[in-house]
């Protein structure tokens, strides 16, 4: 059973916030999230951190301005997730408005893997700025070779149409070999990324990454889309200084904030003060009907209203449908949807994304069932081994005895292992790495971690302890990707477990549900629920939840799998909803809940959305 913990907060900070006229409950909530000054809650664009604070942003802007002035050919190299797709769309839309000759290329994860690899660089030479005909030529040559990689190695280099500059978005900081290949072939590389750098930086012409050594940018939490947005701000300022807009209006980069908000939320980066401004402004545009046709279309096919859009819609509605393209097919579909200017074209592609997402859910459900069966079989096997083992000191292995989980099934889908790792991490409250089979005896792994184990740093320890185990890896504190040889799976699993045990304590493995304490009855009202919906909540700035003991006055199943509740507290009755649970509740429950605005037939009412419950004694 998880432990329920109330978030600590500074009473002095809460009192100072309340003294400005802020509701005392809101003051307490914000203080628990590190807010000390009301200025931290400002969402105006004028409060954004200035781009000159970003190392190399102005230098990259000068290089891009020179390239545009010289009619150089630019090619954006994107990542195949939502952050990469939105970053690509921001780069393409902005650069075209600035007058650049630009196209994009996104690696297919199943053929090329992640990032600016040497193979992608060689493909970029053939793609140039005539993508369709070049790709057709490569595909024809591939049919004569054993693999696509062999085809790219063997294909003669035609430098006549190659790009002059490659611009990476949401990748590139670890692409040492890829940048080296680009340099050899006479292409400049401009890296924009937000992932943590390794021991060696690529020899790129310019790198913009808030996490790179020597960058004093105060916010280290920008997503890849946020980084390229800052570069575009710097580029506009550079073009302005050159007199480009002396006789014509400047491009309005604020119209790209819907894309910035989507990528920021979908990539689950921390919503610090700066990111909350970006997300707030993006949501404001979406709600006002000024989003790009692609985002509107995805919301529409999902049955969501743009005017009511929230961070939930970005993270759990639009993001997964966009990601489905990169997981199961080709992220070019998602990028084209975001670049579409026609509502009809955007809607057609949004329907395709929705279909891919439904397929992804089915695959995910099968993989999750397979993973749970595998862990149960391991436990049963260990029990049988213990029962038949008479030697002193025999121990029973269960997944719960481990500090980490590494799982592999040859039938698992490479594009869905990240979601699988996330689901298993939530279930077991342990770092989880799920592997799927790739090519040439390789396994692709995707990991998710918990507080207390920085996943990228843990993988770095594996690499330093046993360099032959990891072919490549990268990521963040809570998510990372890696490649190993299948023959090394068992040894990697054991080594990663050793490192997990050295970094984590048993207390770290206990699931903790954080909430914001109890609410007084007068505060449990519709006005407070509405006030809470006006803030941007997400990773690192969690949506408020509260804890109370209720008597269950009535309960009924709705929609076959949810419970509609009447909950009593101190003589008051509150409407409640418990999703994905249709078994009867006990008479008394201890519940963690959120204040929610329920809209029905044009009217609004307070609803308690139950996040967690356990049986309680009478309150």
Model-based region annotation:
Residues 539-559, 591:
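Structural detector for short beta-strands of small beta-barrel domains
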Residues 488-492, 588-619:
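OB-fold single-stranded nucleic acid-binding module
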Residues 555-560, 578-583, 596-607:
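Single-stranded nucleic-acid-binding OB-fold domains
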Residues 2, 7-132, 136-140, 144-165, ...:
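Hydrophobic helix-and-loop "lid/oligomerization" segment in the mid-to-C-terminal part
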Residues 568-584:
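Beta-strand/loop nucleic-acid-binding surfaces
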Residues 465-470, 498-505:
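A common structural junction motif
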């Amino acid at each position: 059973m998880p432990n329920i913990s109330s978030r600590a907060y500074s009473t002095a900070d809460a009192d100072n916030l309340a003294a400005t006229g802020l509701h005392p409950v809101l003051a307490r909530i914000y203080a628990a999230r590190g807010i000390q000054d009301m200025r931290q809650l400002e969402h105006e664009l004028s409060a954004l951190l200035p781009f000159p604070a970003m190392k190399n942003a102005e230098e990259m802007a000068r290089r891009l301005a020179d390239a545009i002035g010289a009619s150089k050919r630019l090619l954006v190299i994107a990542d195949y997730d939502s952050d990469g797709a939105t970053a690509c769309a921001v780069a393409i839309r902005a650069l075209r408005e600035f007058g650049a000759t630009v196209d994009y290329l996104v690696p297919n994860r199943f053929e090329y893997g992640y990032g600016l690899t040497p193979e992608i660089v060689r493909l970029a030479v053939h793609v140039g700025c005539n993508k369709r005909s070049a790709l057709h030529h490569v595909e024809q040559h591939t049919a004569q070779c054993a693999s696509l990689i062999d085809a790219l190695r063997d294909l003669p280099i035609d430098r006549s149409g190659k790009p002059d500059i490659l611009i990476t978005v949401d990748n590139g900081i670890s692409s040492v070999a890829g940048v080296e290949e680009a340099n050899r072939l006479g292409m400049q590389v401009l890296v924009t990324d937000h992932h943590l750098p390794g021991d060696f930086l690529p020899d790129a012409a310019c790198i913009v990454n808030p996490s790179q050594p020597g960058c004093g940018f105060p916010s280290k939490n920008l997503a890849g889309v946020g980084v390229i947005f800052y570069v575009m701000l710097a580029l506009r300022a550079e073009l302005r200084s050159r007199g480009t807009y002396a006789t014509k209006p400047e491009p309005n980069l604020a119209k790209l904030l819907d894309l910035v908000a989507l990528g920021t939320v979908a990539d689950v980066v921390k919503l610090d003060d700066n990111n909350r401004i970006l997300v707030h402004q993006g949501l404001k545009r979406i709600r006002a009907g000024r989003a790009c046709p692609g985002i509107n279309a995805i919301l529409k096919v999902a049955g969501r209203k743009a005017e009511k859009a929230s961070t939930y819609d970005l993270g759990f509605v639009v993001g997964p449908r966009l990601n489905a393209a990169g997981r199961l097919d080709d992220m070019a579909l998602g990028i084209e949807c975001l670049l579409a200017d026609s509502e009809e074209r955007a809607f057609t592609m949004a329907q395709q994304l929705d279909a891919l997402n439904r397929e992804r859910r089915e695959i995910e459900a099968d993989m999750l069932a397979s993973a749970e069966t595998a862990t149960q079989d391991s436990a049963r096997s260990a029990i049988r081994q213990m029962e038949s083992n008479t030697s002193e000191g025999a121990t029973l292995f269960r997944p719960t005895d481990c500090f980490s989980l590494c799982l592999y099934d040859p039938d698992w889908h490479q594009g869905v292992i990240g979601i699988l790792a996330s689901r298993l991490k939530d279930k077991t409250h342990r770092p989880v790495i799920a592997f799927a089979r790739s090519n040439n005896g390789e396994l692709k792994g995707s990991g998710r971690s918990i507080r207390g184990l920085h996943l990228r740093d843990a993988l770095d320890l594996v690499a330093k302890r046993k360099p032959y185990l990891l072919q490549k890896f990268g990521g963040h504190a809570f998510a990372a990707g890696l490649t190993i040889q299948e023959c090394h799976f068992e040894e990697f699993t054991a080594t990663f477990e050793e490192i997990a045990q050295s970094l984590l304590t048993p207390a770290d493995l206990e699931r903790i549900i954080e909430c914001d304490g109890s609410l007084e009855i007068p505060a449990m009202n519709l006005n407070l629920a509405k006030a809470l919906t006006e803030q941007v909540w997400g990773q690192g700035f969690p949506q408020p939840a509260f804890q109370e003991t209720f008597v269950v006055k009535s309960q009924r199943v709705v929609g076959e799998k949810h419970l509609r509740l009447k909950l009593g507290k101190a003589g008051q009755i509150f409407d409640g909803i418990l999703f994905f649970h249709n078994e009867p509740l006990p008479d008394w429950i201890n519940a963690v809940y959120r204040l929610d605005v329920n809209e029905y037939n044009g009217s609004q009412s307070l609803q308690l959305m139950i996040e967690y419950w356990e049986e309680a004694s009478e309150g």
